Regions:
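A conserved acidic, glycine/proline-rich C-terminal tail/linker
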Residues: 67-129
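A residue-level signal for beta-strand positions that form part of recognition/binding surfaces
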Residues: 52-54, 105, 135
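Surface-exposed interaction regions enriched in Ser/Thr/Asp/Glu
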Residues: 134-140
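Anionic-ligand-binding alpha/beta catalytic cores of soluble enzymes and soluble regulatory domains
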Residues: 1-69, 74-77
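Flexible, D/E/H-enriched segments
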Residues: 29-30, 35, 110-115, 137
């Protein structure tokens, strides 16, 4: 283990060495004390409305992709959803960035199953001034 573990670099100081030990064949139970009472942080949730959901931006990654608090599993028909953010409307949630043109504002599923707002080959956050906690209105159409 590393001699100094800093509270802000767990990826470097804890997770990377742990992965290396596991890859080298060290058993998980030999790597340290079992934590029986982990602190679990609640994820923010989208609020149900008469026409869909009121969501918020909960994460903006280094590429400017903006994950919302709405899970894709909450959307009854991906093609019939309209998302409104930063004065823009996005029609439908598509399977991948490749379903739209370069520069288009798009809604896709992020790696955690949440609706993500992105710009194909660009930064939605930068292009539209999107910030954490910005509101996202999601409307379902029949």
């Amino acid at each position: 283990w590393l001699e100094n573990v800093y509270t802000t670099f767990h990826g470097r100081d804890i997770f990377a060495p742990s992965g290396a030990y596991l890859a080298a064949g060290v058993k998980l139970e030999d790597m340290g004390t079992i934590i029986t009472d982990p602190v679990r942080l609640p994820l923010p949730k989208a609020l149900k409305t008469e026409t869909g959901y009121q969501a918020n931006i909960m994460l903006i990654d280094v590429f400017g992709n903006c994950s919302t608090t709405l899970r894709v599993s909450q959307v009854p028909d991906l093609a019939k959803a309209t998302l409104k953010i930063a004065g823009q409307s996005i029609e439908g949630i598509v399977p991948s960035y490749g379903h739209r043109q370069i520069g288009d504002l798009v809604a896709v599923t992020d790696s955690e199953g949440f609706v993500e707002i992105a710009v194909v080959n660009g930064s939605a956050a930068r292009a539209y001034g999107i910030n954490l906690d910005d509101p996202v209105e999601v409307i379902f159409h029949d």
